[in-house]
Amino acid sequence: MKVAAIQMVSTPDVHANVETARRLVAQAAQAGAELVALPEYFCLMGLADTDKLAIAEPLADADWPATPSTPLQHVLAETAREHGVWLIAGTIPLRVDSALDDHSRVFNSTLVYDPTGRRVARYDKIHLFRFDDGQRRYDEAAVLRAGQQPVALDVPSRDGHTWRVGLGVCYDLRFPELFRQLGQERPLDLIVLPAAFTDTTGQAHWELLLRARAVENLCHVLAPAQGGLHPNGRRTHGHSMVVGPWGKVLAEQATEGEGVVLCEIDQARQTAVRHQLPALQHRVL
């Protein structure tokens, strides 16, 4: 199955970001990608963290997202349908259930659309990033509410295989137990992890962690990322990539800026690796 990781440098202009995302998804589809993943915060990298609150949407109907209050979900569904791809739509801010009486925070949510444009999965980011090096401080919990439920789904590819896909977002990458739990029912074939790693943490840990999660789970990892200097002054690490089950980086965008990272992932190769080193069968704890 050919997969694509989209790299962006999103801005405070939601319309421009969405149009960039649509153009890059179209480029990936034209190159033969069956599954396309957008980066975290693809629709908005605001000047302030609270900018997310202004564009937050309620969760739309899975089959009919075309409502005035859900424009982002509408365009995502239409993009998946137009190009006939599985679209793992980075993250968008979704409103917290009004019953929780929390209007100051939103969920940072990954929505997944099938090639007909139907929403088939939702994952709310569980682990919220906090960073303080004495000079810079960032705390996602100020505007985000943590999700509670790990999410995996089955994605059938055109060659007849069914891929077990586990979802994570950015900081989730640092918590291997999440992906172990996702693989309890059935081993994961692919982890998809939209991200907006800071350049500081990215230089130190991004590739290391992606390769570690691939090796631990003997699966592929698809990691679309924000990559570059944003108008808010934040620099994200980029290096969107695909990692194979042996821990080898199979494809990568090594430069800043927007782009499409394409890779053919091979289930037969993954099966061979698992036979060669059946670590998943050797677990004791």
Q: Where do the model's predicted regions map?
A:
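Short beta-strand scaffold segments in enzyme catalytic cores
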Residues: A89-G90, S109-V112, V151-L153, S240-V242, ...
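Active-site catalytic loop in hydrolytic enzyme cores
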Residues: L59, D97-R186, T198-L208, R274-A279
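CN hydrolase (nitrilase-like) catalytic-core segments centered on the catalytic cysteine
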Residues: W64-I88, L173-V260
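Extreme N-terminal starter segment of soluble prokaryotic enzymes
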Residues: M1-A4
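Cys-nucleophile CN-hydrolase/nitrilase-fold catalytic domain and related Cys-dependent amidase chemistry
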Residues: V14, R22-T116, D124, T198-A212, ...
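Residue-level detector of high-confidence beta-strand sites
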Residues: S109, R122-K125, L193, E252, ...
